[in-house]
A protein has these predicted regions:
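Hydrophobic structural segments
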Residues: 1-268
């Protein structure tokens, strides 16, 4: 299988038309005619993930987040004076690693919709973007669950996503209509309100949006952008295997500890 075959098969499964207009998906750097020797699936395209790919014998780095949205002015070795994407592209070329990304087109997939609530044993009824059309691809997951307090839900999320979430709302409030949106909540809190959700689980949310939703009676749980989307790497890996890349040559890059919070004298 060539890199171009892998890219076209992935984009057939997660179409470009489902990506946001501003997004950068597909092959960013690499030789389309190179034979695929192995694929490392990673949330981000970083120097560390490139080197991890090489150490595993992989010449394709398949990521959720694009190496860039807008291309940097130059592609050079690492420097504090240039964006990190400049060095990543430079190093990818030097190492002969192709970088393919599936971003908002993956976010809108049925696989992504099922992924996050599935970690808690919940099923998505529809997307948050198109709540009245369960068959349509769309961002987010609208769910229903047995009544649970916001505090207990937050503990389950902490354990399932291995993170230290930020929670808005009364921990004793009972919720039963959660909605999930990996990454950044943005303006989708209003869609959650209109859809009748009573708690939104996301990666990150601005202070004023979280405060507003909380004051209107909705619980908000922010897991961390990266923690909320790391499960998507398994979707990428499964897609590669189903396309025909041998399972023994497909890997998932563990999420690095990029941020931390102090707790009881330790760092977690």
């Amino acid at each position: 299988m060539l890199v171009r075959d892998l890219e076209s098969s992935l984009l057939a499964r997660f179409p470009r038309r489902d990506a946001e207009a501003w997004d950068h998906v597909g092959l960013s750097v690499g030789d389309p005619d190179a034979k695929v020797r192995g694929v490392l699936c990673s949330l981000d395209a970083t120097l560390d993930s490139l080197h991890a790919a090489c150490s595993l014998g992989c010449n394709v780095l398949l990521t959720h987040h694009p190496v860039y949205i807008s291309a940097p002015d130059s592609f050079c070795p690492p420097s504090a004076e240039r964006p990190s994407s400049s060095a990543v592209v430079y190093e990818a070329v030097r190492l002969g690693v192709s970088v393919i990304s599936l971003h908002t087109n993956l976010d809108r997939s049925h696989e992504a919709r099922a992924s996050l609530p599935g970690l808690l044993g919940m099923e998505a009824r529809s997307s948050l973007e198109y709540p009245s059309d369960p068959d349509a691809t769309g961002l987010g997951s609208l769910c229903a669950c047995d009544p649970i307090t916001l505090g207990d839900l937050a503990v389950r999320l902490r354990d399932s996503f291995e993170t230290a979430p930020t929670v808005w709302g009364d921990p004793k409030m009972t919720v039963s209509r959660p909605t999930f949106l990996g990454g950044s909540l943005g303006d989708f809190g209003e869609l959650a309100v209109r859809a009748g959700a009573d708690v939104v689980v996301t990666g990150e949310v601005g202070y004023h949006r979280a405060q507003d939703l909380s004051l209107r009676g909705m619980g908000v749980v922010a897991l961390g952008h990266d923690r909320s989307e790391q499960p998507f790497c398994s979707i990428l890996a499964d897609a590669c295997v189903s396309i025909g890349v041998p399972a023994e040559h497909v890997y998932v890059n563990p999420l690095p500890m990029q941020w931390w919070v102090p707790t009881q004298g330790d760092f977690a």
